[in-house]
Amino acid sequence: MRPDLIALQERLQHVFSDPGLLERATTHRSFSAEHNERLEFLGDSVLNLAVSSLLYQRLSALPEGELSRVRANLVRQESLYQLALRLPLAQALRLGESLSGNRQRRSRRRCADELQPDEAGSGGLQHPSILADALEALIGAVYLDAGYASAQALVQRLFQDVEISPRMQAAARDAKTALQEWLASRKMKPPQYQVVARVGAAHCPTFEVACGIPALGLTERGSAGSRQAGEQAAAAAMLATLKARNL
């Protein structure tokens, strides 16, 4: 196993019985066709369940709608990015030349709005969406390697130094949270999100995401430079439709 993966494994406090899962979790689609996006998809669901369980235990007096707000704060891209920075994850990521090398710098500049000011010349290693997605992929990899209990334990370790309180709820009321609260107040199931298209170069993709409410027969779409942002855009479009129809 590569030294950077050994260091990451030690920080995760999980020894993989299948090292290939760790390898894939740290491989971006710009590097190989055997990339981490399916693990990210799985890890996203495991993360939400584990965080929901954590909040259910810690904030026992909080009602459902407010729990959803706190959870949204904890699992949003910026929060996951900050958690990922505490791990040697950026060093272990395998990225294509367009992200890790000095080539195609002009192409990268076209996505400059997605980079943080201190990321110039970093080759995308500290790009928030890449690191946040990779962290979700790691959670998915641990789940496949050792089951839900191990993945849940990892999530608990990741959040052990994060202050979790009802005060977090105001910062998290984004479009997805607002839509989920609207549905919950009407005793309806959460919306369904699905990536329906991904276009553009690997280092500068655009995700088209569909947001559906089967009970109402409604579907709206949104596009952005990451899956999470695409979901927010789709949720915002759905909220606009609900408002326009006076629902």
Swiss-Prot record:
Taking every annotated instance into account, which residue ranges of this chain make up the domain DRBM? 174-244
Residues covered by the RNase III domain: 5-147
Alphabetic keyword roster: Cytoplasm, Endonuclease, Hydrolase, Magnesium, Metal-binding, mRNA processing, Nuclease, RNA-binding, rRNA processing, rRNA-binding, tRNA processing
Task: Tell me the cofactors it needs.
Answer: Mg(2+)
Give me the reactions it catalyses: Endonucleolytic cleavage to 5'-phosphomonoester
Known CDD domains for this protein?
Answer: DSRM_RNAse_III_family, RIBOc
Q: Which GO terms describe its biological process?
A: mRNA processing; regulation of gene expression; rRNA processing; tRNA processing
Entries under InterPro entries matching the protein: dsRBD_dom (IPR014720), RNase_III (IPR011907), RNase_III_dom (IPR000999), RNase_III_sf (IPR036389)
Q: Tell where it localizes.
A: Cytoplasm
Q: What is its main location?
A: cytoplasm
Annotated EC = 3.1.26.3
* Single GO term (MF): rRNA binding
What PROSITE patterns does this protein's entry cite?
A: DS_RBD, RNASE_3_1, RNASE_3_2
User: SUPFAM superfamilies, from UniProt?
Assistant: dsRNA-binding domain-like, RNase III domain-like
What family name appears in the similarity comment?
A: Belongs to the ribonuclease III family.
Give the protein's recorded name.
Ribonuclease 3
What lineage is this protein's organism placed in? Bacteria, Pseudomonadati, Pseudomonadota, Betaproteobacteria, Burkholderiales
State the encoding gene. Answer: rnc
